[in-house]
Amino acid sequence: MTVTNKPVEPANVPVMDFEAIHASVGNERKEYLRQLDEAWSHHGAVYVINHSIGTETLEEAFVWCKKFFDLPLAVKNSVHIPPDVSKHFQGWTGTGEAISSQGVWDPDEIERLRKEMPTELKEAMELQDPCGTYPPGNPDLNLVEQHLPGYLDFLKKWFAACYKQSLQNMRLVCEILGMEDLDYIGKKFEPRHMSTHSTWNYFLGQPVSQLASGSSNRLNAHTDYCQFTMLFQDMVGGLELHDYEEDIYRPVPPIKGAMIVQVGDLLEKQTNGRWRSALHRVTAPSRYMYGGSPGGDDELVQRYSLVFFGHLNLDEMIKPLPGCEKPGKWSTLEWKDLMTAGQWLARRVALEYERKTAATVM
């Protein structure tokens, strides 16, 4: 995509007030649920304000995020993500080590894309619940704690807060789908079972002109492979959502304190296509991309984001939820085989992070 003087309108993603929803009854509540249903069907995403993750916790998370990425390279390398990341999904990755893609399943094709596509100029820290028990092989986050005292305690706080909000999301899903047991999904979504995951992202500063011309990149277009994504942006911007009707990407501007709740691949499959897995990407802020402000060759400010993924328990089969027997509109990714949530996660993670052979690692 190139810079254009023609404005691109932001995605018409609705803003939902969760405090108001939880306090509502009767017809008012039915209308709120209808709006959520429509948003997840049409956009695959919704802004949420007045959620249960307090402003103080969110601001603290961004402080810790920046502190981590400001650490010396040697410290970050000490918790580098393992080569067999599909089995040990935790650790830091540097620029160019991962590649986001959509609908590409052939490892040879992924390697070709790595060589031909612009490098995603970002670092990431993949995090599992610090209270969980995992097979040997994960990086030891105590190595970070030695340089950032209090880091692990905050991670416990962060995961607990995000898990609580995720359960609220799942109860609303059950209510929209007409389930009697509003904890039906939550019972198959347990912490410390690799069902919760968080990614902290740092997008490097780079010339605006490179991003706008497509010669440089921040995050390729992709869907998320979870049930729900809870995304927290800083105020820099750059997130874009695919508009299927117009076949263009539209900006999703940050709203201070809000989170964006996106439908992932698993939930699209579980709702049998009723809701769409949100295809999205990260590029330059819209004021640079679409003619609002000439970026020139000035350095683009850095960007940080915090992401929390709710994932079905790994041993659960992926199949339609009760009430979703009738196929819906969406089929973002064709799945030929019935598989468990763990198999799906391993497949997507391996394509994003694992290299075909050790000799190809840059």
From Swiss-Prot:
Q: Which cysteines are joined by disulfide bonds?
A: none
| UniProt note: phenotype after gene disruption | Leads to the accumulation of exo-1-acetamidopyrrolizidine but no lolines.
| Applied value in biotechnology | Loline alkaloids show broad-spectrum anti-insect activity, and different lolines may have different biological activities. In vitro tests of NFL, NAL, NML, and semisynthetic loline derivatives with long carbon-chain acylations on the 1-amine have shown that many are effective against both fall armyworm larvae and European corn borer larvae, but the effects seem to differ depending on the modifications. N-Formylloline reduces the weight gain of fall armyworms by deterring feeding, and does not significantly affect corn borers.
What residues does 2-oxoglutarate bind to? 303
Write one Gene Ontology MF term.
dioxygenase activity
Residue intervals of the Fe2OG dioxygenase domain: 199-312
Which keywords, in A-to-Z order, does the entry hold?
Answer: Alkaloid metabolism, Dioxygenase, Iron, Metal-binding, Oxidoreductase
Q: In which pathway does it act?
A: Alkaloid biosynthesis
State the EC number(s).
1.14.-.-
Q: So where does Fe cation get bound?
A: 222, 224, 280
What InterPro entries does UniProt report for this protein, alphabetically?
Answer: DIOX_N (IPR026992), IPNS-like_FE2OG_OXY (IPR044861), IPNS-like_sf (IPR027443), Iron_ascorbate_oxido_reductase (IPR050231), Oxoglu/Fe-dep_dioxygenase_dom (IPR005123)
Q: Which domain of life is it from?
A: Eukaryota
Q: Which GO terms describe its biological process?
A: alkaloid metabolic process; small molecule biosynthetic process
Q: How is the cofactor bound?
A: Binds 1 Fe(2+) ion per subunit.
Gene3D superfamilies given in the database record: B-lactam Antibiotic, Isopenicillin N Synthase, Chain (2.60.120.330)
Q: Which cofactor does it need?
A: Fe(2+)
The similarity comment for this entry is: Belongs to the iron/ascorbate-dependent oxidoreductase family.
Tell me, what does this protein do in biology? 2-oxoglutarate-dependent dioxygenase; part of the gene cluster that mediates the biosynthesis of loline alkaloids, potent insecticidal agents composed of a pyrrolizidine ring system and an uncommon ether bridge linking carbons 2 and 7. Lolines are structurally differentiated by the various modifications of the L-amino group and include norloline, loline, N-methylloline, N-acetylloline, N-acetylnorloline, and N-formylloline.
Protein name per UniProt: 2-oxoglutarate-dependent dioxygenase lolO2
Q: Which organism is it from?
A: Epichloe uncinata
